[in-house]
């Protein structure tokens, strides 16, 4: 393979990898509204507290869970597991 083609392929792979890493970390919070919500259930043991999103945020209605290591993740309040977790976790 030519060196320029190899370099171009490496750059392309790096760009795809960075995009994938970035999209996973952005599954959380953007200022005051959730852009995306979790697809899978978050174990209760990782959650410290929660806060509800304001009414000015677009659908779906969501909460932000503050996790043990200072991270935050959004979850849709339409999901049964989220409603159950809200009964067991204190607001922030």
From Swiss-Prot:
Q: Gene3D superfamilies of this UniProt entry?
A: 2.40.50.40
Which consequence is recorded for altering residue 68 to K? Answer: In strain: DBA/2J and SJL/J
Q: Does the keyword Phosphoprotein apply?
A: no
Query: Which cysteines form disulfides?
Result: 33-57, 34-74, 49-92
Q: Name one GO molecular function term.
A: chemokine activity
Give the induction note: Produced by T-cell after stimulation by antigen or induction by concanavalin a (Con-A).
Highest taxon of the lineage: Eukaryota
Glycan-bearing residues: 78
> What's an example Gene Ontology biological process for this entry?
chemotaxis
Listed A to Z, the keywords are: Chemotaxis, Cytokine, Disulfide bond, Glycoprotein, Signal
Q: Where is the signal peptide?
A: 1-23
Q: Does the keyword Glycoprotein apply?
A: yes
List, alphabetically, the InterPro entries matched. Chemokine_b/g/d, Chemokine_CC_CS, Chemokine_IL8-like_dom, Interleukin_8-like_sf
What Pfam family does this protein match (any one)?
IL8
A Gene Ontology cellular component where this protein is annotated is: extracellular space
Q: What does this protein do?
A: Cytokine that is chemotactic for neutrophils.
Family, per the entry?
A: Belongs to the intercrine beta (chemokine CC) family.
Protein name (record): C-C motif chemokine 1
Protein's organism: Mus musculus (Mouse)
Name the gene that codes for it: Ccl1
């Amino acid at each position: 393979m030519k060196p320029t083609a190899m370099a171009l392929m490496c750059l392309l792979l790096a760009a795809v990898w960075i995009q994938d890493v970035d999209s996973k970390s952005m599954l959380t919070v953007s200022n005051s509204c959730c852009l995306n919500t979790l697809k899978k259930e978050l174990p209760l043991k990782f959650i410290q507290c929660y806060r509800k999103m304001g009414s000015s945020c677009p659908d779906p209605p969501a909460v932000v869970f503050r996790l043990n290591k200072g991270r935050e993740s959004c979850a849709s309040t339409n999901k049964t597991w989220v409603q159950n977790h809200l009964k067991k976790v204190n607001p922030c």
